[in-house]
Amino acid sequence: MYEPARQKMIVSLGQEKIPPAHSSVCLLDKWVNTHHTTKKERYQLNVADVFSSYLSKLPNVIIALLVLLIGWAIAKIIEKAVYKGLSKTKIDDKLFAGKKPSRYSSEKVISKVVYFIALIIVFILFFNILHLTTVASPFVSMLSAIAAAIPSVLKAGLILLLGWAAASVLSFLVKKIGMKLNTSDKLRKWNLVSEGKDIHQAVNTASQIVFYLVLLVFLPGVLSSLKISGISGPFTNMMESVLAFLPKLFAAALIVLIGWLVARLVRDIITNFLASIGTERFAARMGLSIYLKDTSLSAVIGTIAYVLIMIPVVISALDQLDVAGISKPAVSMLNTILNMLPNIMIAIVLVLAGIWAGKWVKSMVSGLLHRAGFDSVLGKMGMEAGTPAKLSLSQVVGMIAQIIVILLFTAEALQIVRLHFLVEIATGIIAYLPNVLVAVFILGLGLYAGELVRKVLASMIKGQEFKSLAPIAKYTIIALAFFMALDQLGVAATIVNSAFIIVLSGFALAFGLSFGLGGKDFASRYLSTFERKMQNTEIEKNRKNQNPPNDM
């Protein structure tokens, strides 16, 4: 029965050594006495120990709280001091001039960073005073990392400050030079700006571009100092490419600027020279003023010279850029245009010659037809106009002849510049013109013949009942001519032929029915007379057969 009690006793007493004799009894008695003592005094001992432990730690807690409070106050003081010091430098106003104030300025951000670093130091002291090393160790590691990064940050800050100073100086120089070197007059002369406000805006824009470009040049050094290799490496490569490309870009821009100035100068010289020698009078004599409404021939020639100069200039600038993806297709296209320029010039000369020849043909054809009395043809066709027309018939024919001549020259010009699709269209139109002319001739002849037949029938046929025969004959001839003209034009030949046959058959049927129904009495009398004549002829023949003549 003592075995379970003995095991508990051994565990609770830490297996204290007991003499072998009477071991079981001694162990049991000692365990019982110890057990009864703990039950009575344990609570009092625990309360006293806890209270004394708290009392021993209370000074550390008070000191830690004082350190936390004082450290927080010092951190706030440092934050305000840093903010005021940075505000006096006006960094944001210099870096972001002309922009709306941001919600978080650089002064506020930097002062907050300093404030939180000071708070980290205060928390480290607070937790160390309380002997909470486990809680303080992350803050210590964080502060150690910040302290280790301070040299890099200072180095990056110095590089950024140097870059900002260099950018500010260069931007200031650009602005001053732009305002003092009579740039405004040159920009107005080149028609790049119109007002003084635009000039100031252009100069300010140029100075800001210089400012940010210089900052970008210093930015890879800042990133390298901060050891941000994930960003600094690609950004450094990009900046190296940009810096290597800038001389090419500057050279290309310089080439374009010089070429543009030369092209403008040549254009103005050619335009003024051609205007002084009377090119506009020549254009008016050639009839080109109609096509040059808002400009002049000298201005057009000057613009052509301007374009011819700018094309090789642009080719040279693109070659200088050495950007294969852009320069090669563009250079190839411009070279193709340059190779086509002789053909284009010949084509332009042909078109101008066609316009001049068309004008000459128009005047000649109109004059010949007018002297031949062609303007009275419409009157002979019965198509007199109630009010006099702006253009006479001879002028209309002359204009058609002019269009045909211009079209012929234009087709040849398109053939020279190898615009085959347009050549096919122009050739098709020219090939179709004879059909149109023949159709117009047939229709005009039909109108003339119809009017002539109407007049002849009206003069020959008297009587009210035959009054409608003359118009019917006229419009029958006109309809016949109209169908012949459509057939000549090839407009739905099957339908036109079928319609003509149907109309002609209708006329024949109508004539037959009208003759059969309206001329029934006349036909019966005519047939009776014809029958009597036949009978009389037979009787005379029989008499001759019965009384033959006597032969001698």
UniProtKB/Swiss-Prot annotation:
<keyword id="KW-0749">Sporulation</keyword>
<dbReference type="GO" id="GO:0008381">
    <property type="term" value="F:mechanosensitive monoatomic ion channel activity"/>
</dbReference>
<dbReference type="GO" id="GO:0030435">
    <property type="term" value="P:sporulation resulting in formation of a cellular spore"/>
</dbReference>
<protein>
    <recommendedName>
        <fullName>Uncharacterized protein YgxB</fullName>
    </recommendedName>
</protein>
<dbReference type="InterPro" id="IPR045275">
    <property type="entry name" value="MscS_archaea/bacteria_type"/>
</dbReference>
<dbReference type="InterPro" id="IPR008910">
    <property type="entry name" value="MSC_TM_helix"/>
</dbReference>
<dbReference type="Pfam" id="PF05552">
    <property type="entry name" value="MS_channel_1st_1"/>
</dbReference>
